[in-house]
Amino acid sequence: MMTYNKKYIDSVEYDLIETRKRMWMMERKKNEELLKKYQQAMSDLEDYKNLYMRQRSEMENYQRYIEKTINNIKANANADLIKTMLPVLDSLDAGILHDEKLKPIRSQLIKILSNYGLKEIESRGKKFDPYLNEVVGIVKGDDDIVVEEVQKGYILNNEVLRTSKVIVSKGGNNEQDNRN
């Protein structure tokens, strides 16, 4: 009977060992599957994180683009409106030559327009600047000095809106008038 029991015990022990091996193999296989799923989930998470960061960056760039576009539209709308006001300023300048009472009106209009970025180009007595001035006449005198402004020029938000039409002195030349 001992041999039978030993065989039985050996058999049970063998089954137990085999069952443990199978369980260990199943756990190992399950752990490997879980590890693969975990690694895939982490990879997917990284992909989604990168996608989110790209989308966020694109959205921020789009918002900056929209803000810039809106500012450009506002600036251009102001520029168009102010350009239409320049002939009014020219008329006031011409009127001031005949009636000094128009000076406060012109000053008030210039003050309002300066709130929108308009600045007058000061040219008289200064060296000629081709970016700010347009020569309409030349007289004898010191080289490249603006002696008279025929028409005021204006700068809007650091861009030339209209150049000043000026008469410039040139050394040794006879007086010429090239007005258009």
Swiss-Prot record:
Q: Which PROSITE patterns match?
A: GRPE
Q: What are the entry keywords?
A: Chaperone, Cytoplasm, Stress response
Q: Where in the cell is it found?
A: Cytoplasm
- InterPro entries from the xrefs? GrpE, GrpE_coiled_coil, GrpE_head
Q: Which CDD domains match?
A: GrpE
Single GO molecular function: adenyl-nucleotide exchange factor activity
Q: Which GO terms describe its biological process?
A: protein folding
Q: Which GO terms describe its cellular component?
A: cytoplasm
Assembly and oligomerization: Homodimer.
Q: So what does this one do? A: Participates actively in the response to hyperosmotic and heat shock by preventing the aggregation of stress-denatured proteins, in association with DnaK and GrpE. It is the nucleotide exchange factor for DnaK and may function as a thermosensor. Unfolded proteins bind initially to DnaJ; upon interaction with the DnaJ-bound protein, DnaK hydrolyzes its bound ATP, resulting in the formation of a stable complex. GrpE releases ADP from DnaK; ATP binding to DnaK triggers the release of the substrate protein, thus completing the reaction cycle.
Against HAMAP family, the record matches this protein to: GrpE
What is the name of this protein? Protein GrpE
* Source species: Picrophilus torridus (strain ATCC 700027 / DSM 9790 / JCM 10055 / NBRC 100828 / KAW 2/3)
